[in-house]
Each structure stands twice: as structure tokens, then as C-alpha cells.
């Protein structure tokens, strides 16, 4: 097991020692970390050894080049995503390229991480006397947020990653259950999960937790899939009692084609309705972008003036799209999946390019 967790001193040290190839603006301070404005994702690809090797090498090359935020999930490639991160961490740490304390490692739980899905869930959890989990706890055949399930999945993620502490642990797309269970039941389930995660933070298994969503924070309050961020934060505060809660992160898609988190008012905070990222900032919650380049789809459809303004000599539209997302005001980091060495090298070129400032960004989308 790799001991330790991301620390303020060591993540700042990571940023400082990469200043020869990276601009200081490539890094941001949030939640007692200094982390890169680009994070490496591990979502796409088949669950085989060839992809494992590519993902492992992509992580190693990214960390060597100035990216110290790594994002995965237990269901990514049926647990191979996390196991590829472990292989990369072992190589990086054994070679003394980096220390564990310099890296911000994030994972998620909630989806079924096995090909057999319902059969596996029934065998491992419903028919297992170790757990008090019912068939009704599995929603849409793919998702469970029963506290015992999440606790067990967190333990499995720690084993897959080979680490003592996950820096940020997300409940993965809980809005999957909305529209199937009632809103009251949903927030009740959320409260039970948060109780488990607060205890996990107390035990040093995680540093912070959050919710990773696809729709939840971007859709309007009238939508069945809407998650109320203020209410969610209040639940965490209630569970934490007098001490500060550890619900400190959200993850949501942000890219040139999906701007709702930036421009669409969907979240009420202190009587005002705000876009999700603005609301998160006001509530003291850090926002991370997923799908930062929309998996490079449909980039040709965007106005040439936007792509030109983002270009700054960037060679490819996908780089311009990533530059756009990591420049969103109030956003901590933009995730991008990487496997090919060429894509890693291309994305690393952005670490020597400053993000747009708030005024430039506002002019771009205005």
C-alpha cells in the first residue's frame, strides 16, 4: 500500500519544480491542494491489458509533464481504470519521480463495476448476509447508493488504487436515481451516504468528497434530474455538526457545446438563482470539469472566431477546446482522457500557455 495523501506543502512543491516547463498559471490552489488546471481522466477504452498499458504510460507522462490531478472511478473499464492508476503510481513513486503527497487522486462510486451487473450485484450484496441491501436499492439496473454499498466500493477502490487515502471521492451520477425514486427518498439516501463519507474522512480513507454528475447541476429546478446544491451542502453540514463538512467538490461537464454550468441559472443560493459553477463558488464547493473537449466531437461546428481567439498558435481544435474549458472562471481543473502518447504530448503544450483571464473569457462567450 502507498501511504500518504495530497498535502498543501508537497502539491505546491510539485508546482514549483515544474516551473521550467509550465507556467505558474497552470496551477491553482483549492481545498488545501495546488493542482494543475488540466487533470488526466481514465474513462474511455476497453478493459484489456493493451489499454491498461496505454493508460498507465499516459498517466506517467502527464505527471512528469506538469499534471498532478488524476481522475478515475471504480466502474471505468470495469475497475481497470483504477488498477491502471495503481500501476502508474507504483512506477512514479518507485522511480522517485514524484511523491504520493504531490498528487491529487480522485475516484468515484455508485455504478456497478462488473459486466454481469444485476447478477453480480445480487450475488455480492443482496444474497450476502454481510450486507443489509435489498433489490430496491439497485436502481435502473446499474446504480446503487446504499451506504453499505458505497462503503464497500470505497474499500475496493482503495485496494484497486493501492493507496491509503483517496483525496477526493465522488458519489457518481446520483441523479441516475431521480425520476425513479421520489425526491424525498433521494435526499434521504444522499444523507445516509454522506454520513458514511464523513466517517471515511475521519478515518483517513478520504480527504474530501463530492458529487460527480452529468445532468444534476446543469438542468433547471423543474427537471426531474435536478440536484439542489444548496440543499446538498446543508445536508453535509448537518451531518458534520459543529466541525466543517468534507463535501467540498462537484464534477460536471463543461465544454464549448455544454455551457449550462457557466451560463444557465439552475441553482438557488441565498434567494438568487445562479449557474452551477457560480453557485458552487459561493457555497465553498470546488468545481471540476468533465468532458472538457466533448470527446473532441463536433468541434468544427463552433464559430471560427472562437476557435481563432482560443488558438494562440495552438495546433489543433481539441487543444483550443481544452484551453476554453480550463479558462472557465471559478473552475479548478478541466479533465481530459488520454491514452495515446501523441495526445499526452499535445495536451501538455497547454501547460506553457496561460489560460484566458475572466475578461477575455467573458468577451469570448458574450
What are these regions (language model features)?
Residues 2-26, 59, 78, 88, ...:
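Beta/alpha (TIM)-barrel catalytic core signal, keyed to glycine-rich beta->alpha loops juxtaposed to Asp/Glu
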Residues 29-48, 107-141, 170-178, 294-301:
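N-terminal small/glycine-rich loop or linker at the start of catalytic domains
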Residues 40, 70, 166, 209:
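Glycine-centered flexible beta-alpha turn that most often forms the glycine-rich phosphate-binding loop
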Residues 41-54, 134-151, 179-186, 305-315:
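Active-site mouth loops of central-metabolism enzymes
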Residues 57-78:
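Catalytic domains of carbohydrate-active enzymes, especially glycoside hydrolases
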Residues 61, 65, 161, 328-329:
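Structural motif
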Residues 71-72, 107, 211, 289:
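Hydrophobic residues in well-ordered beta-strands that form the structural core
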Residues 79-95:
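Glycine-rich loop at the start of a catalytic domain that most often binds anionic cofactors/ligands
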